[in-house]
Amino acid sequence: MNQEKIMKARMWTAIFIALAALVAAFVFAGLYSDEKTKTRQSYIDQYEYNITQAADEIDKYLEKQTDYDLHYNMVLSDMGAARSFIFLVDDYAEHQKTINELHYCFVKYPVQMKDKLEEVSTALRHITEHLDKGYDEVREIVESVDRLGN
């Protein structure tokens, strides 16, 4: 009889530990999901911030028309940072491809891109306003670049 009580107590302890572990697993999964969502949103916020910075830098150059190299390099830097952050967001593959192509055009074809700065600024503003036409405008700009030129 004594042995039976000990086994019953051990069984209840095992059940209690199993339930506690199950609850802990659910809590961990919930916290992980919440943190993942926050991190994703922070990446998107940084992406949009860098896109805004690039558009602001283009606007500064268009307004003053001085020190092109400085403003162009700042735009390159901001576009590179935006590219890096959008890479970290899973379901932004099409947007990532579009931004990568625009950044590539800025790197490889600076002479051609100088003539398209106003269009790029408008497209980037549309992107930060969450308008899909901004990505379409960027695609049009990228397609209009002569890949055989400079």
Identify the function of each model-found stretch.
Residues 1-20:
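N-terminal Sec-pathway targeting helices
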Residues 1-3, 29, 33, 76, ...:
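Helix-centric, low-specificity signal for extended rod-like, repetitive segments
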Residues 4-8, 36-41, 60, 140-143, ...:
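Polar/charged alpha-helical tracts
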Residues 22-45:
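Transmembrane signal-anchor/signal-peptide helices with a preference for the extracytoplasmic
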Residues 27, 94-112, 128-136:
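Hydrophobic transmembrane alpha-helix bundles
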Residues 27-35, 53, 57-60, 122:
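Short, charged/polar, low-complexity loop and linker segments
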Residues 42-106, 125-126:
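Alpha-helical segments in soluble extracytoplasmic regions
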Residues 110-150:
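C-terminal amphipathic alpha-helix
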